[in-house]
Amino acid sequence: MIKPKKLSSLMKQAVEETVPSIMVFTTTGSLLAYVSFEDPKDGLKRLDLAKRVRSIAALAGNMYSLYTATNPSPLVAESTDDVIAHQRDVLFETIIEFERGKLLIAAISIDGAEDKLYSKDPLLLGIVGTENAKEGMMQIKSELLKECITNELSTLGKPV
């Protein structure tokens, strides 16, 4: 299984003032790891932050599940086999704008690691941005984090 502390230290490098929270969770909304720019010392504030992050993960997982149930492929189906095969390789990624911020949800490929994660469903990466966060920077952070997490997943179960 992937180690949450290692995952958190990887994600900690990408948080900043305009990207205050990053999380990895399942499609059911179960939180695997998260990091936050703010590090409250007070126990109640830390608990409130954890509740907020879990709520975002649950909401994003639900949105992903609803989207894939109604639109299993992000591309319009064509009759050629090449296009249909390509559609299966395209992973879900979207940015949702809210009144007080943005949320990027991206699927992480777990090809070859399904047996180690005990799931065939993709992991999801959530990047929370403030209203001042640039979508392009959020997407770059998403791509880099997905690549690092995929590399980490590929080393699971291999001798060190």
Curated annotation (Swiss-Prot):
One CC-aspect GO term: fungal-type vacuole membrane
Keyword Transcription on entry: no
Chain segments annotated as coiled-coil in the UniProt record: none
Keywords: Cytoplasm, Nucleus
Subcellular location: Cytoplasm; Nucleus
Stored InterPro entries: LAMTOR2-like
Keyword Glycosyltransferase belongs to the record: no
UniProt record, GO biological process: cellular response to amino acid stimulus; negative regulation of TORC1 signaling; positive regulation of TOR signaling; regulation of TORC1 signaling
Domain of life according to the entry: Eukaryota
GO molecular function: guanyl-nucleotide exchange factor activity; protein-membrane adaptor activity
Signal peptide start and end residues: none
Protein name as it appears in the record: Uncharacterized protein C1778.05c
Species this protein is from: Schizosaccharomyces pombe (strain 972 / ATCC 24843)
